[in-house]
Amino acid sequence: MKEPSIVVKGARAHNLKDIDIELPKNKLIVMTGLSGSGKSSLAFDTIYAEGQRRYVESLSAYARQFLGQMDKPDVDTIEGLSPAISIDQKTTSKNPRSTVATVTEIYDYIRLLYARVGKPYCPNHNIEIESQTVQQMVDRIMELEARTKIQLLAPVIAHRKGSHEKLIEDIGKKGYVRLRIDGEIVDVNDVPTLDKNKNHTIEVVVDRLVVKDGIETRLADSIETALELSEGQLTVDVIDGEDLKFSESHACPICGFSIGELEPRMFSFNSPFGACPTCDGLGQKLTVDVDLVVPDKDKTLNEGAIEPWIPTSSDFYPTLLKRVCEVYKINMDKPFKKLTERQRDILLYGSGDKEIEFTFTQRQGGTRKRTMVFEGVVPNISRRFHESPSEYTREMMSKYMTELPCETCHGKRLSREALSVYVGGLNIGEVVEYSISQALNYYKNIDLSEQDQAIANQILKEIISRLTFLNNVGLEYLTLNRASGTLSGGEAQRIRLATQIGSRLTGVLYVLDEPSIGLHQRDNDRLINTLKEMRDLGNTLIVVEHDDDTMRAADYLVDIGPGAGEHGGQIVSSGTPQKVMKDKKSLTGQYLSGKKRIDVPEYRRPASDRKISIRGARSNNLKGIDVDIPLSIMTVVTGVSGSGKSSLVNEVLYKSLAQKINKSKVKPGLYDKIEGIDQLDKIIDIDQSPIGRTPRSNPATYTGVFDDIRDVFAQTNEAKIRGYQKGRFSFNVKGGRCEACKGDGIIKIEMHFLPDVYVPCEVCDGKRYNRETLEVTYKGKNIADILEMTVEEATQFFENIPKIKRKLQTLVDVGLGYVTLGQQATTLSGGEAQRVKLASELHKRSTGKSIYILDELTTGLHVDDISRLLKVLNRLVENGDTVVIIEHNLDVIKTADYIIDLGPEGGSGGGTIVATGTPEDIAQTKSSYTGKYLKEVLERDKQNTEDK
């Protein structure tokens, strides 16, 4: 019988060249090829899109309005499709309420666990809060030694101010003879006058007994009487012993701290029943940050040390500041840091109740006199932020504020009541601070009573199962309370992967986009095993991937190419990895078999004395490390996932340099000092954030080449005759653009119960410009034709205009020759956006004093693309600039001049320097995981060179 398969015929999405392919079902299929070759077009835009469309089409119109309608992909037929699930990197929630625990649903089970077997404790007295029946109280008292004398007391006043005369009188009228007031037994008729300004505790003596058999009935009656008098509280005064406290309700018998019935919603920070009332469950509050208010403490007040009060059109605040300094004799020409602590406190937090009189010039002209209490700069910013009706003022004030942990819940997000419930010795706020590996260990060994164990058994099974899946995809270092908005694309994707395995679905088609991103080679095996486990459940996996190990582990490998863009879109080779390796036409096969490779450089640039020195870096999990980053060479920062690479490079290095060089308001991670910044004049962070958030932004506008192209069109004879200036050829301003679509080229049509539909503008036919503008041509092409050209085509078209050719060539050099000049920024992948940014920096003149910071540069890149990119980075270094890269890819690591390896583990087990030096030095370091894999690569490359 023929093996089941997915048969695709006539796929033409994007650059696909009418391809036919048969893919085996229930196998691990890896699709690879150059960046832009058409992998995603086949995997996501054809196979997944059709699988999803068919599923959605089977639903009712009502259900479809929530799921969105998908267009039919440009393909003749696809047979053998299963329901499709896509796990990509773009759907990370930026909601501050979303955490690793909530996304994976682990938190739902933890909440249930605390609601079912949690034990509430009084936060003031650290005693367990229990609700007890009268029978339980009797049993506990009868456990006392025989002949023990006891008094049953009803606490009617607990530590409250007042003389309480009326209450004492009422107790006497009810027939009670004795009271215990502040620990002393007194007759109800001889109570001394109580000081109404002091706290008092008054307890009614309900009964006096000797513990012996046969008193149970009398004891129960007396307990009931006491509980009625004191609203459910009872104190047993054991003569010559310690008092026993009992409570009929969930309340502390000493202070009355009460807690309602334990429910799962009580432990949710997204519910008003559980959230901290101060921060509404966010764990953080926007607070004025003194370091942003006074960013440069070497400045004097006259030089503008207090940044929010630097003079503007009104001199209200500068005049007030001057008057305050006169009154309190503060020298305005003294550096802020040299002022006394008292003087700084007055300026920042106010002068108390003392009123200050001053005269200031109004914005409209004229002077005005004011008398007011000086509130201080910090309270002033906070007040204006919270009370101002002006959006502009609030935005300006927010620049001087930062998110700090909430002072009530200390960042734990929950109410005091929720944090008073314990399971296995920890409250829920403490548990979610654990990393996944710590939490897994904790729940596997949790100590519960036999009864609680029986109740919690099924819940614990679910928690342990989900934690195990997360652990198996290399995420053991993530803490459960980590905000999902701070996760990298690869981490977010692996979390969704773990969630899918947890669902144990079978017969599903999963389409994944580079799940190995951000994963160290050490953790790759676990990821591959996870993928195989999903396959073994009876699912088909299509993985778009460039990672060597994943390609070798595939059951079926598809190489798409041979080039990118117009030069791609064909199946170059398909079959087992061994078959593809033998195929001479397959570029991927050549690299996999070692016939082609990225060579180790013949020499490495030595680390010079010029360096940036970071001392005492403590951001996130960094353990107060000292690091030197040599200048004018290529440094790669390595380490297992979660070892502290991003904390060091992005949080400490980049943000501190941005603060000093660019005068940025970002707040760096914690460190003691950084030296050597004066050797740099420019810092460029090339990350994967979009180059623009609107369809109007594109590679041509971002790199600035579109300005030069518009200049060329404005210089043509036709444009001069018509009097067209450069602005005529912009689609962002009135004049040359099509006014029907405002230069977008597309028009949005609202479909109400269906998703919005975008259709080409009928007036300009999607060209963005009006007819008159399009009549102006250069070498037979109008401005709209230029935007539809690929970068490669445009480079040839403008080869005689050096200024334009140089900028376009940099895009080709970074492997973006296949992208069209007018491609909407919103449709570029993270890796493509990153390379557009790199290209726009490349054509700028180098000062030799720039530092480039790149994070996971190889995302979405084939080995051949990486080879080209390394040449570009080396060009930057040859100019004297510094390149710092966070990277796991061994081809990049082996070509570095200098490596900083962090670790040894992830999360709390990381944050230290494992090794520094050349790749050869790291390869010899036995404690380095990176060194272990690097050694294999260097030896393999050496062997291949000798074989040749």
UniProtKB/Swiss-Prot annotation:
Residues 309-587, 607-935 form the ABC transporter domain. InterPro entries: ABC_transporter-like_ATP-bd, ABC_transporter-like_CS, P-loop_NTPase, UvrA, UvrA_DNA-bd, UvrA_inter. It comes from the Bacteria. Its main location: cytoplasm. One of its GO terms (cellular component) is cytoplasm. One of its GO terms (biological process) is SOS response. The keyword NAD does not apply. The keyword DNA-binding applies. Keywords: ATP-binding, Cytoplasm, DNA damage, DNA excision, DNA repair, DNA-binding, Excision nuclease, Metal-binding, Nucleotide-binding, Repeat, SOS response, Zinc, Zinc-finger. ATP binds at residues 33-40, 639-646. A zinc finger (C4-type) spans 252-279, 738-764. The UvrABC repair system catalyzes the recognition and processing of DNA lesions. UvrA is an ATPase and a DNA-binding protein. A damage recognition complex composed of 2 UvrA and 2 UvrB subunits scans DNA for abnormalities. When the presence of a lesion has been verified by UvrB, the UvrA molecules dissociate. PANTHER family: UVRABC SYSTEM PROTEIN A. Belongs to the ABC transporter superfamily. UvrA family. Forms a heterotetramer with UvrB during the search for lesions. This is UvrABC system protein A. The lineage of its organism: Bacteria, Bacillati, Bacillota, Bacilli, Bacillales.
